[in-house]
Structure formats: structure tokens, C-alpha cells
């Protein structure tokens, strides 16, 4: 078994050392990613780019953890302090700093996790599509399938060969969004009331079996506490697919995209 992990940082380098220490004692288990940074302001800054590029080489990171482009504000106690007047965290994908970062990181040949939620499709799809086209040799991974619809997932995956998605948090509908308009824009979850894969999602998982990755989004203590339950839920989901498809999504695609060498 392997698990891909990255630190979550509200200041540059926060929690990075702790994860490196954890990896030092679990090298056969952990696949390291560069830290996710929460405090980008409208664009990616030079200090983030410099530090991330340096540490990709220093620590042999296999991917860049989530670049937080869009994130709708949630209405729950764990998100207090992260509400915004606009109802979202937003980092413009067409920014100069984003382009500068990708020009440099694309030479490292590792994927970049691109956290984009599809609640403002008309604004964001043209910009992200251009971004993916501008950097055809850079692999991008969209977590949670963007919480989008089958139609949106199909359009992105069929248009851009260099874009992949994780299936984390897609077992059920996205909830707890403060803005009801944004809430209404999220796509459906995978499962019906009988815990069976909806036909429209099953078609997507089979058609794009080479571009989808299992993930749990175990980013806080409450997610780790139910980690085993999350894994069981997704085993039940993948067991509803042909075996060769489930193996790709469960681990084979991750081995390829993170360049994991089996011992």
C-alpha cells in the first residue's frame, strides 16, 4: 500500500517538517507532495514559487499539493474564519504568477493538484481550459472531480489529455455551502439512495478509467478518524465496476502519474 500526502500550510513551510519526519519513518508507505498553501492573494507569489521549486528538488516531491484556485465557503464550525464577502476563496488561473510557476514546475515532470470547484462554470471553464492548453506537457489533477456533473467531467477529460481527476468526496452530494446559488451549481454524487452507482456516473468512470484516481481527502482529524469507513465506501463503489477498471482507479493510475516504482 501507498498513500500520497502533502502538508497544509497557512504560512510557507508550516507543517512541512512534520510530514518530512513522518515520511522518514515510513518511506515505503508515504508518497510526498509539496505543501498546499492557503494564503495566495489573487495570484501565486514569487516566494511560494521559489520555495516550492527548491523543495521539489531537495525532498524529491512526487507532486505539487493542491493549488487552491476556487473553494466555496462552507457553513460549519470547522470553517469559521474562512468565510469571505464573495462567498469563496479565489485565485485567478490566468494570473501572471500562475503562469510563471507553471513554466518552472513543468520542467520537473510531476503533476500539480488544481483545486477547482465547478460552481461558477461560465467564469472559470474558459480560463482553466486555456491554462491546460497553454501547458500541454504539465499534468493537472482536479480533486473531487471539481464537485461537478457528469457532463462537466466528460467535457474536461475529453478535451484535455493532460488533466486527471480524483474521485474523493464524490460518493454523495456536496452540502454545507453558505451561498445557496453556489450550492445549486454543484453536481450530483455517485450513489443513489440504494448506495448503487448512478448510470451516468458509472459511464464516466468506465469511459475515463485511465484518468481517475481514488483519494480520501483525509485533510483533518475528523477525516482520519473515519478513514477506514471512507475506504470501505469506495471499495463498495469500485466493486460495482469491471475489475480491470476498479484496479486502475484504485491504484494503477496513481502508480503511473506519481511515478511509483514497485519494489
Q: Which residues does each PLM region occupy?
A:
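Active-site gating/metal-coordination segments in enzymes
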Residues: 15-111
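Active-site-proximal beta-strand/loop segments in catalytic clefts of secreted hydrolases
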Residues: 6-9, 33-37, 66-70, 114-118, ...
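An N-terminally biased module of ancient metal coordination in phosphate/nucleic-acid-related enzymes
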Residues: 1-23
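Well-ordered, non-membrane alpha-helical segments in soluble/globular domains
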Residues: 12-19, 45-50, 93-99, 124-126, ...
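Active-site environment of divalent metal-dependent phosphoester hydrolases
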Residues: 10-14, 39-40, 70-74, 119-124, ...
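Mid-to-C-terminal alpha-helical segments outside catalytic/metal-binding sites
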Residues: 1-3, 199-213, 219-263
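Catalytic pocket-lining loop regions of alpha/beta-barrel enzymes
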Residues: 24-28, 86-214, 242
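Divalent metal-coordination and catalytic microenvironments
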Residues: 3, 32, 64, 105, ...
Amino acid at each position: 500500500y501507498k498513500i500520497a500526502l502533502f502538508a497544509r500550510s497557512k504560512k510557507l513551510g508550516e507543517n512541512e517538517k512534520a510530514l518530512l519526519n513522518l515520511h522518514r519513518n515510513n518511506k515505503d508507505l508515504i508518497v510526498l507532495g509539496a505543501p498546499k498553501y492557503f494564503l495566495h492573494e489573487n495570484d501565486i507569489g514569487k516566494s511560494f514559487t521559489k520555495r516550492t521549486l527548491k523543495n521539489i528538488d531537495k525532498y524529491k516531491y512526487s507532486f505539487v499539493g493542491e493549488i487552491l484556485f476556487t473553494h466555496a465557503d462552507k457553513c460549519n464550525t470547522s470553517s469559521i474564519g474562512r468565510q469571505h464577502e464573495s462567498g469563496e476563496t479565489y485565485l485567478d488561473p490566468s494570473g501572471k504568477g500562475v503562469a510563471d510557476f507553471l513554466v518552472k514546475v513543468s520542467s520537473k515532470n510531476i503533476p500539480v493538484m488544481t483545486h477547482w470547484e465547478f460552481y461558477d462554470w461560465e467564469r472559470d471553464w474558459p480560463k482553466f481550459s486555456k491554462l491546460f492548453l497553454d501547458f500541454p506537457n504539465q499534468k493537472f489533477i482536479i480533486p473531487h472531480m471539481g464537485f461537478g456533473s457528469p457532463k462537466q467531467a466528460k467535457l474536461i477529460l475529453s478535451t484535455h489529455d493532460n488533466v486527471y481527476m480524483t474521485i474523493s468526496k464524490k460518493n454523495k452530494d456536496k452540502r454545507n455551502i453558505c451561498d445557496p446559488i453556489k450550492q445549486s451549481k454543484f453536481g450530483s454524487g455517485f450513489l443513489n439512495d440504494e448506495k448503487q452507482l448512478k448510470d451516468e456516473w458509472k459511464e464516466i468512470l468506465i469511459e475515463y478509467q485511465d484518468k481517475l484516481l481514488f483519494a480520501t481527502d483525509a485533510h483533518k482529524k475528523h477525516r482520519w478518524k473515519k478513514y477506514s469507513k471512507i475506504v470501505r465506501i469506495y471499495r463498495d463503489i469500485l466493486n460495482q465496476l469491471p475489475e480491470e477498471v476498479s484496479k486502475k482507479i484504485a491504484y494503477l493510475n496513481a502508480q503511473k502519474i506519481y511515478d511509483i516504482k514497485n519494489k
